[in-house]
């Protein structure tokens, strides 16, 4: 008789975020990240006719700030509960889409934005190729994530679906250029304070599709 495996299954990243969705906006991390949107928008030209994809949109940290400036925002995330919180905010021109980026994106975009989602995707090269394919010619990216760190930012990395402990700009730039993106530039956009007493810098990576 085969012994039963009593090891509890590791929760999926989506289930982690589903469980956290209700009070996500009130968490210290989210309140610090609220400073990102205006700094990102200062470096991302947008027009009232633009279609924008917010990758890893969560409860709408970026989407809700971008929506008044453009025609439509598609908020993509794997957590249905996070997107439900976003929907409840009542922005008529934000469409939510729960699914995997590699299952196909629901449109073409003039800009793709993201905040603290890249490190949740194992294959960064494939992700950047998907972004490039989904952009109109001349379309722009504005992506925020951690500079390289030692894994202490999240702590419980497996439970939270963390595949990368931040990124080295030169490595990320090379992958973006291989995906067909140009004009890649990095600026430090925020320093986050964590309960372990440390600060972690975040970058804003910008670029465009020729």
Segment roles from a protein language model:
Residues 116-117:
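Short catalytic micro-motifs in class I SAM-dependent methyltransferases
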Residues 205-210:
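C-terminal lobe and adjacent flexible extensions of AdoMet/dcAdoMet transferase-like proteins
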Residues 8-12, 27-31, 62, 142-199:
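C-terminal alpha-helical "lid/dimerization" subdomain adjacent to the S-adenosyl-L-methionine
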Residues 51, 139-140:
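Short glycine-centered segments of the SAM/dcSAM-binding site in methyltransferase folds
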Residues 2-46, 61-62, 85, 190:
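Conserved class I S-adenosyl-L-methionine
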Residues 126-137:
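A short glycine-rich, Lys/Arg-flanked "PGG" loop and its adjoining helix->strand segment in the class I
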Residues 113:
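A conserved beta-strand element that flanks and buttresses the S-adenosyl-L-methionine
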Residues 53-103:
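Class I SAM-dependent methyltransferase SAM/SAH-binding core
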